[in-house]
Each structure stands twice: as C-alpha cells, then as structure tokens.
Amino acid sequence: MVLAQLGGSISRALQQMSNATIIDEKVLNECLNEITRALLQADVQFKLVRDMSTNIKKIVNLEDLAAGHNKRRIIQQAVYNELCKILDPGKPAFTLKKGKPSVVMFVGLQGSGKTTTCTKYAYHHQKRGWKPALVCADTFRAGAFDQLKQNATKAKIPFYGSSYTESDPVKIAVDGVETFKKENCDLIIVDTSGRHKQEAALFEEMRQVSEAQKPDLVIFVMDSSIGQAAFDQAQAFRQSVAVGAVIVTKMDGHAKGGGALSRVAATKSPVIFIGTGEHMDEFEVFDVKPFVSRLLGMGDLSGLVNKIQDVVPMDQQPELLQKLSEGHFTLRIMYEQFQSMLKMGPLGVFSMLPGFSAEMMPQGREKESQAKFKRYMTMMDSMTDEELDSTNPKILTESRIMRIARGSGRLVHEVMEMLEEYKRLAKIFSKMKGLKIPKKGDMSSLSRNMNAQNMSKVLPPQMLKQIGGMGGLQNLMKQMGSAKDMMGMFGGGGGE
C-alpha cells in the first residue's frame, strides 16, 4: 500500500536520526532530505515541502538549543507538527446528529468511485447504530441505479431510485428524501450524477438538486490519483455547491495520495474519510493527528479500538477488548488479526500500535508478507482449541509441534518460526495491559485515562528514551497542555 511506503520512508528517516550518536546539522539535513524526498514522491506540492523543511530548521536551531534539551524529541515533534499543518484544513467537519433525519448529498467526478463510496458511508454509519438509506439521483450515467441497487442490497441498506420511469434527478431526490423521512431514517444519502469540471449543464443540475433538497452536508468524492490537481477540482465544486467535506478514494493504489490530501486541505475543506480498497469495510475515518502519528510509527490507539469494532462481530467485541486490556494475546487472536491484516492492508490494526507501523508488511514486500500470514494461518488451522486459546506457549511441546507440522503440510522449523512471531506479538500487545479501553469505543474515556504512567506502557522503550524517559514524558504532557493533546500527538482522540 502506497501510504505504508510513505510512512515507512518518513519513520525510517526519523529512526536513522535517532540512532545517530550526535545530532548535528549534517544529521538533521539528511533526515529532512529523506522526508522531503518521500513527500515529493507522494506528489505533495514542492512549495509546501520546502516551507515545511524551512520551518523545521527554524524551530530546531541546533546552535541555540541549550545543553540538556532532547534534540531528537524536538525534531520529531517539529516534523509531526509540520506534517499536521500540511494536512489540516483548519476547519472542522460538519457533525451529524442522531435523533433527527440528516440529508447528505454526494457529488464528484466521473470515475471517482462516488456511488461505491455512498454505500461505504452508509454501511459505516449503519454499524454505528444509524438507520441510513440511499437515493440514486444519477440519471446521467447508464447503470448508475443498478450499481447502487446492487451495493445497497449487499449491505442491507434501503434504497430509492428509478432506472427507466423517471428522468428528472431533482424529482427523484425530493421524492426519495421524503419517502425515507416518513420511514424514520436518520441518515439519507443522495447520490448525484458524476461530472467533469467543464460540464456546465451537469453542474447546474447539481445546484438544482442541492437547492431542492437543502442537504445538511455536501460531500465531494475525489480520486486520489489526480494528486495536486485536487485543488482545482475541489475549488470548482465548492464554487457550485456548499461542499462541507471531502472523501478521498483509491488511496491503496496511487503514489499521489499525499498530494491529493495536502491540496484538498489548502481549499479549507476537511477530509473525513479515505477509501483504501474496493471492499465495503476498506473505508477509514480520516483524522489528521492520528493519521500523521501512524505515518511516523507512533501508533493510533483510538483507531485500534475503532478497527477492532469494524472487523470483530459486535457480540465478540467486549470480550476481545477485555482480553487486550488484560494483556492476553492468544494464537487465536493472532489468527484473527492476520485475517484483518489481509483485509485492511499494512495501515490496519498493527500500524496503530506505537512503534510497530511498518514491521508486519515491509515496503516492497507486501505480497511476501501476505503469503507468510496465510502459511501461519494454515498451521494454526491444525491446532486444537486448547492450543489456540492458551496464553502459555509452553503447552506446545515438541510432539505437538510435529503434529501441527504434519497436519498443515509444513516443516517443523516453519512452525517454530510462527511461534516466535507469536511470542514477539504477545510481548507488544502486553504493553496494553492496564489500559482502560472503552467497550463501546468512547475514545474520550480513553483520553481521560491516558496519564503519563499509562502512556509509558504503550510507548516503545526507544521512543520513551528519545523523549527523556518518564520525566521527559511528564514534562512534555505538561507543556502540551493536557492528556488529550498528548493523545493527539501519539494518535489518540480520533473520533468519527
């Protein structure tokens, strides 16, 4: 996944800087050059990258820093802040409210994945207790209604539209919204015709649909492959209708995702979701601070809980969250997380653990890593329930290991390798022991409980050392004003 490559490049640059014996101007320049190269390859605008590098050098004036200052931490924090600045539009997204029907209108270019994204958006909210419905007001593209109907049926979401009998998109939108309001749907999503920037007639149609239904929110859906051109496209749509938020699609397959995100931010339009694949659950809430935290290998604890809630069946969530908060990590949980990794890619569950973002799927070796997960899962398929659910690896005696190897058609040393991987992951997940993880995804509760003692448990020793140990961590949290801000830096506080 391209985002993982960008994150891997940036986190490696910071790691190399941290490993240097002495932090001098040469080391700082090498670090910034690597980060600059990675951002330019992601199609981030040259001026933004240049300004970021200049700002970091101003903040991190090595000659003026008094002895005793932690230069590594100051550099890391400056990189974090500047990346957030590039991606932050400085304007919060509109918040939908339960209890009253909200109408959301989707607009976008042809081929951006708008119709599929409508269903993903509805599905995301349906899993969180909303009652969504879909209205197809796209009468321009042949097959638009059939596509929406197929997607909605698969996701078990009610839909409204007409393939042949009605050709007026305004009437379809108005009738559909009224129908679903009567059925007490609290999230009504209207899909409009996809269009090109220069198509004046279709832009006029979009305005008419908007004026007729007066949506609470207009979402612009944009393909990440257009990169820096996102600025012009987003501006064109903003001039026609009141775009309140943006969803960037196809972030899994293009090198220009960083450029698209940064240029959308320049239009002051908040990005609220990113599409990371074709499947219904390959759809992530976009929040700048957790996103940057993950790119830098700092993790995203709030995203971890949200991902668990997305992937694990509702009735199993409390049990899994409780096990993780107790530090229990079994082979069965590892099996399930490998399944999640295969579904979600490298920016899935493991990337949300601090200091662990790129280890499971190294850059350029994604297919090799996926094949390894499948081999491990085949071995675990030959295990008993007792073996899968035990937290004591010693029960896997030599005779059991030989039985597992025979049953899975693998070699004994491959089973041993899988068990070593399990021990390593169990050690990392044990860092979550003692954290009060909310069972219903209330991340404000997690933020309130995230004091310096708890934070030190989940930070890798190397990162804790970089910020000056427990004393440095406490001072940093004090300087940043609150535990909530600290959670922001290390990936928390990400809501819907």
From Swiss-Prot:
PROSITE patterns in the cross-refs: SRP54
Pfam family, one: SRP_SPB
Location(s) in or outside the cell: Cytoplasm; Endoplasmic reticulum
Reaction(s) catalysed by this chain's protein: GTP + H2O = GDP + phosphate + H(+)
Quaternary state and interactors: Component of a signal recognition particle (SRP) complex that consists of a 7SL RNA molecule of 300 nucleotides and six protein subunits: SRP72, SRP68, SRP54, SRP19, SRP14 and SRP9.
HAMAP family the record matches: SRP54
Domain notes: The NG domain, also named G domain, is a special guanosine triphosphatase (GTPase) domain, which binds GTP and forms a guanosine 5'-triphosphate (GTP)-dependent complex with a homologous NG domain in the SRP receptor subunit SRPRA. The two NG domains undergo cooperative rearrangements upon their assembly, which culminate in the reciprocal activation of the GTPase activity of one another. SRP receptor compaction upon binding with cargo-loaded SRP and GTPase rearrangement drive SRP-mediated cotranslational protein translocation into the ER. The M domain binds the 7SL RNA in presence of SRP19 and binds the signal sequence of presecretory proteins.
Similarity comment: family membership: Belongs to the GTP-binding SRP family. SRP54 subfamily.
Entry protein name: Signal recognition particle subunit SRP54 1
Naturally occurring in which organism (per UniProt): Solanum lycopersicum
